[in-house]
Amino acid sequence: MPSEKKRGAIVSALAKKFVVLWTVAGGPELVAEHTFHPTRKWRFDFACKSARCAIELDGGAFLPFGGRHGRGMGMVKDCEKYRAAADLGWRIWRFTTKCLTAEAVAMTAKSFRLSMKEKTK
């Protein structure tokens, strides 16, 4: 089960659902709110540091005026963050509320396990 952020932050319903699905799928241990960049304060919602794999949960995509991830500048900032992560060797799986399903999470957990095996070769 992923360790939760210790700073008393509110854990979203989307994050709680992800944790349940990830646990059921037998996914490897994750760190919540992992700061991955050496100079920026960017964080991944969940990360497997040893495999450099991360989960991003994009809530609010279907709100009438869009959430942060669906607005112009939010999308621009997300792109900047994801490019920087790729430059550092990270792989990222993104989920919205609609695509956070047991099947999708199970497939992602399998990909994480394969990435962990590749890193140990």
Question: For each predicted feature, which ranges?
Answer:
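Nucleic-acid endo/exonuclease domains
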Residues: 1-121
